[in-house]
């Protein structure tokens, strides 16, 4: 009698496993907060893994004396992780009742140590949620099992971010996923404009997907990412932070303005002469300006002022 063929069960992709683990938070926090609970922790783990990798390189290079010198990390585009932000320390604190406060402290110290992360990480966030310590510790344990540096394509964390952002957009429903534009659409837009070099601007950048895909386009065509400068602006504070984390994880230097702000009413790049404007604006915004506001704005000089009833024309002229 012939033996039955053994069924080989392929392991689930890491992003799927993480999503399933994160689902256990449902009911404990609002869906609108859910993404920030998870993505900030994934970012912290990724930053620590890169730090540990660089630390080992320094030891192998005979530079152990410089293990705590931040310059030897930032020069390689690696975030320097202060003691308070070390993942190993956080895991030791996972059984403590004030775990949420330790996570907040870790994120605050990481942002303070690294200039490029200013404004990117949540502040005093986890303690304010009142999240059950056991659920938070369980999520930490699952993320702890992930080696974020072993992806064959070298972009595991980018994949996790894209997967989660897409899932969050679906989970939050129509009108609640403005921070995410499907990457198939972004890819098509990028292929159409071919941004090999110059300044790219997205006035409503969401989570930064336009910039990420632009860099992927350059890599696919053997271009030089240093020939591209990235500028953007985002209105929603939490989405602004997502964008900064998303771009930092990819090593993309960007100027998203000093803080989240309305592009129409507080343009943070008034003198920018962009070579490419790549955007998916929130269409059909009503009452986006008052009757006497922005009437003589220089962005539509020589054209009729966009109507107050719909911002579409304003986005085109922007």
Identify what each model region corresponds to.
Residues 1-196, 255-268:
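Non-catalytic, mostly N-terminal accessory regions of nucleic-acid modification and defense proteins
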Residues 5-9, 129, 148, 156-158, ...:
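A generic short-segment signal for beta-strand/edge and adjacent turn/coil regions
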């Amino acid at each position: 009698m012939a033996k039955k063929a053994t069924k080989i069960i392929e392991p689930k992709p890491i992003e799927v496993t993480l999503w399933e683990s994160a689902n256990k938070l449902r009911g404990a926090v609002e869906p609108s907060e859910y993404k920030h609970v998870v993505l900030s922790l994934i970012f912290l783990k990724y930053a620590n893994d890169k730090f540990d990798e660089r630390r080992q390189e320094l030891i192998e290079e005979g530079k152990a004396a410089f293990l705590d010198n931040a310059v030897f990390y930032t020069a390689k585009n690696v975030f320097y992780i202060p003691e308070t932000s070390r993942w190993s320390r956080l895991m030791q604190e996972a059984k403590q009742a004030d775990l949420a406060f330790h996570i907040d402290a870790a994120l605050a110290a990481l942002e303070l140590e690294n200039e490029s992360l200013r404004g990117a990480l949540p502040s005093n966030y986890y303690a304010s949620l009142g999240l059950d310590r056991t659920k938070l510790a369980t999520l930490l344990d699952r993320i702890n099992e992930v080696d974020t540096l072993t992806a064959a394509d070298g972009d595991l964390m980018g994949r996790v971010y894209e997967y989660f952002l897409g899932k969050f957009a679906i989970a939050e429903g129509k009108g609640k996923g403005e921070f995410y534009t499907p990457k198939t659409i972004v890819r098509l837009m990028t292929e159409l404009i071919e941004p090999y070099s110059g300044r790219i601007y997205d006035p409503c950048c969401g989570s930064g997907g336009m910039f990420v895909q632009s860099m992927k386009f350059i890599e696919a065509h053997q271009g030089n990412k240093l020939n591209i400068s990235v500028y953007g602006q985002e209105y929603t504070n939490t989405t602004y932070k997502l964008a900064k984390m998303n771009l930092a994880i990819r090593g993309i230097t960007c100027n998203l303005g000093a803080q989240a702000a309305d592009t129409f009413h507080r343009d943070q790049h008034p003198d920018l002469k962009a070579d490419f404007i790549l955007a998916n604006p929130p269409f059909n915004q009503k009452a986006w300006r008052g009757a006497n506001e922005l009437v003589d704005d220089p962005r539509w000089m020589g054209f009729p002022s966009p109507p107050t009833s719909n911002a579409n024309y304003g986005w085109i002229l922007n």
